[in-house]
Each structure stands twice: as structure tokens, then as C-alpha cells.
């Protein structure tokens, strides 16, 4: 069984100071509203309703943590998946956008247990201005980044690969960057992305 398939809900937090103390490795998921973040978490964890997306894009305001139980230490967590609020939806008030920017920036900058960042980008849109703003938070952290180019099934293979090269160029400021075309519905890139995330949590995954 994949390590990620053991994931279960751990805690929700509206503010950074409500998170548990930094400890076990954390992998966070960040992306523009409607980039397919919740769907990606669910398919990676082989669960239909682990992560929820709001019916109104941009309204998911909580940080949601999902624990990955340590099979050798009952009650302990081997690591966490952290679902950060989606950012940048046009209908959200400016004050709310600033609040989200503070949460995203604060978590990425200060969370000592952050082991890796999963950045979700809609492959049909490419890197938007909002994505570039987010890279301003990501690049200085020096953390490794897995860019999932979501909804890859919507593009033919040739166009898909051209977009990969274009996005790589746009994200050149991020040093340790790995890119995977990804589709939650067609399961494109699922195995590669899952293995990458598992390696951040535990280089030696217990079967």
C-alpha cells in the first residue's frame, strides 16, 4: 500500500498559530483556485472525499492537515499533507486576498518542518500572474518543488510537452523544481507524483 493511501484528516486551522508544533515532515499543496488541488490530493491518497473543494471557488479559507500514520509507532505521524487555501479568485474581496497572502507567505517562509511544496498549475492556463506572485514566496525558501500541471488530459501530447517546457522557463527562479503533467480523472502522472511526495516524507517507505 502506498504511504499516501493511509492519509486521514488531522486538523483544520484558520491561522498559522493554530497549527500543531513543527515536527514530522510536511508536504504542502498550493495553487490557484480551480487548479484542481482537492482532486489531486484525493486521487493521490486514493480517497474520494478526503479533501473538499468549495462549491464557490476561492471560499476554502482553512489550512487542512492530513496525517500519515507511522505503522511502526501507533499514534504517531510519519508526516503530513497540508492543503493550503486556494489563492487569487477574482470575486474575493481584496482584504481576504491579503489575509490569504499572509497565511501562504507565512507558512512557506517560516514552517520549519516543510519538506516539499506541490505547486498546482492548470496546464491550459500556464503560469499566470498570480502563480508568479506565489513563486516570490516559494523561491527564497529553497525547498524542493513538484509542479503538477493539472488537467493534462485536456491537451494533446505534443501541446502538453510544449507547455511543460514553457512553464519550466517561467519558473526558472525556483531551483529544485520537478515537473509532472497530471490528470486526476485520467490518472496521468499519478505514480510519478506519488513517489516524489512519498520520498519527501520518508525516503524509506514502509510497505
UniProtKB/Swiss-Prot annotation:
Assigned GO CC terms: cytosol
GO molecular-function terms, A-Z: GTP binding; metal ion binding
Cited SUPFAM superfamilies: P-loop containing nucleoside triphosphate hydrolases
The keyword Metal-binding is assigned to this record: yes
CDD domains for the chain: YihA_EngB (cd01876)
Coiled coil among keywords: no
Domain named EngB-type G: residues: 23-203
Family according to the record: Belongs to the TRAFAC class TrmE-Era-EngA-EngB-Septin-like GTPase superfamily. EngB GTPase family.
Designated name of the protein: Probable GTP-binding protein EngB
Organism of origin: Bordetella pertussis (strain Tohama I / ATCC BAA-589 / NCTC 13251)
Gene: engB
Amino acid at each position: 500500500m502506498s504511504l499516501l493511501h493511509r492519509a486521514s484528516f488531522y486538523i483544520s486551522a484558520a491561522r498559522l498559530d493554530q497549527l500543531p508544533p513543527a515536527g514530522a515532515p510536511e508536504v504542502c499543496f498550493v495553487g490557484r483556485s480551480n487548479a484542481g488541488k482537492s482532486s489531486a490530493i484525493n486521487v493521490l491518497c486514493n480517497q474520494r472525499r478526503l479533501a473538499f473543494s468549495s462549491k464557490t471557488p476561492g471560499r476554502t479559507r482553512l489550512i487542512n492537515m492530513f496525517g500519515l500514520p507511522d505503522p511502526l509507532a501507533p499514534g504517531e505521524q510519519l508526516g503530513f499533507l497540508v492543503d493550503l487555501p486556494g489563492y487569487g479568485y477574482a470575486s474575493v474581496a481584496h482584504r481576504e486576498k491579503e489575509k490569504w497572502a499572509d497565511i501562504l507567505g507565512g507558512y512557506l517562509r517560516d514552517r520549519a518542518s516543510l519538506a516539499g511544496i506541490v505547486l498546482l498549475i492548470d496546464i491550459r492556463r500556464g503560469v499566470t500572474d498570480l502563480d508568479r506572485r506565489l513563486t516570490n514566496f516559494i523561491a527564497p525558501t529553497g525547498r524542493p518543488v513538484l509542479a503538477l500541471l493539472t488537467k493534462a488530459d485536456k491537451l494533446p501530447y505534443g501541446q502538453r510537452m510544449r507547455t511543460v517546457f514553457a512553464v519550466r522557463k517561467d519558473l526558472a527562479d525556483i531551483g529544485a523544481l520537478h515537473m509532472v503533467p497530471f490528470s486526476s480523472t485520467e490518472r496521468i502522472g499519478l505514480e510519478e507524483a506519488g513517489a516524489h511526495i512519498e520520498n519527501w516524507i520518508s525516503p524509506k517507505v514502509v510497505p
